[in-house]
């Protein structure tokens, strides 16, 4: 039996199939952890969703920002729905859309397996969040998303503010939690997120840190696997395992076996698309980062 965590698929169906062949995935005994962003940009989002849906008894999914955006589209007017990109439009107009999208909406924001000592989240955790606190806050939003009033959440979740505070309530609280779990790359020690900084460490605004390098962050009792940050590339450091390696931007699709003492890595080539350049001018010297070799 093996447990493999897989980075952002982003509609790269062919690459996903090749990766499953590469790791010799056996649904009778193996489990897949998908780090979110199953859809968008890759051109085969419908096929990718159908594939992951077919593996639902043998996999765990956490939602990414693109998955939530797709769900948000479904509660808009038909006229607005027709304005989405062709890849997502194929999902919205598919005969099995209700089954697939209902299943997608029922997925988690965080997955924890304390037996093996791992947590999976799409983007990251706020500096002061313990793993237990992150689970609790994620569950707050999951209850809304899985409930009958989910449309209210999907209508109100967009926006860069407010920054997280325990005193928040209502829509503002849910939005802040979603932004941390699905959109964060850089933040301040107080937890304020930068949504503009998307490049590699060293290109960010002064005062911003990669979320896993923020001074004074709490110690965490679980190893974390995440995706979302394609320009960061494969990064294993300080208990963080970032595995979005830009499959949709001409990079690779990555799988990481996490249930063994020695981590195993598998990769296949993604699409041949140039990654967008982020030209934010550096305002501070980047802190040197040390990657740990897989143990």
From Swiss-Prot:
Region (Disordered): 271-295
Compositional bias per record (Basic residues), positions renumbered to this chain: 277-295
Signal peptide: none
CDD domains: MPP_ApaH
GO MF annotation list: bis(5'-nucleosyl)-tetraphosphatase (symmetrical) activity
Catalytic activity line of the entry: P(1),P(4)-bis(5'-adenosyl) tetraphosphate + H2O = 2 ADP + 2 H(+)
UniProt EC number: 3.6.1.41
UniProtKB keywords: Hydrolase
Family: Belongs to the Ap4A hydrolase family.
HAMAP family in the record: ApaH
Described function: Hydrolyzes diadenosine 5',5'''-P1,P4-tetraphosphate to yield ADP.
Entries under PANTHER family matching the protein: CYTOCHROME C5, PTHR40942
Protein name as catalogued: Bis(5'-nucleosyl)-tetraphosphatase, symmetrical
Origin organism lineage: Bacteria, Pseudomonadati, Pseudomonadota, Gammaproteobacteria, Lysobacterales
């Amino acid at each position: 039996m093996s447990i493999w965590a897989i980075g952002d698929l982003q509609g790269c169906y062919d690459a996903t199939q090749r990766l499953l062949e590469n790791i010799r995935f056996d649904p009778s005994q193996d489990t897949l952890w998908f780090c979110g962003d199953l859809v968008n940009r890759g051109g085969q989002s419908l096929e990718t969703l159908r594939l992951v849906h077919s593996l639902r008894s043998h996999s765990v999914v956490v939602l990414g920002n693109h998955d939530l955006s797709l769900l948000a589209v479904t509660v808009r007017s038909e006229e607005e729905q027709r304005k989405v990109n062709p890849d997502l439009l194929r999902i919205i107009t598919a005969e099995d859309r209700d089954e697939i999208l209902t299943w997608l909406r029922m997925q988690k924001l965080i997955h924890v397996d304390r037996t093996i000592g791992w947590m999976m989240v799409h983007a990251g955790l706020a500096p002061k969040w313990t793993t237990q606190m992150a689970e609790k806050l994620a569950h707050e939003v999951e209850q809304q998303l899985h409930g009958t009033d989910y449309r209210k959440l999907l209508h109100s979740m967009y926006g860069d503010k407010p920054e997280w505070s325990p005193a928040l309530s209502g829509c503002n609280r849910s939005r802040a939690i979603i932004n941390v779990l699905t959109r964060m790359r850089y933040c301040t020690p107080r937890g304020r997120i930068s949504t503009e900084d998307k490049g590699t460490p060293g290109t960010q605004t002064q005062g911003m840190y990669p979320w896993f390098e923020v001074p004074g962050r709490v110690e965490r009792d679980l190893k974390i696997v995440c995706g979302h940050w394609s320009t960061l590339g494969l990064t294993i450091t300080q208990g963080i395992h970032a595995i979005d390696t830009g499959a949709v931007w001409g990079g690779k699709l990555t799988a990481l076996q996490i249930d063994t003492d020695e981590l195993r890595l598998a990769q296949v080539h993604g699409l041949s698309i140039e990654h967008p350049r982020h030209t934010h001018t550096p305002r501070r010297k980047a802190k040197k980062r040390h990657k740990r070799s897989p143990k």
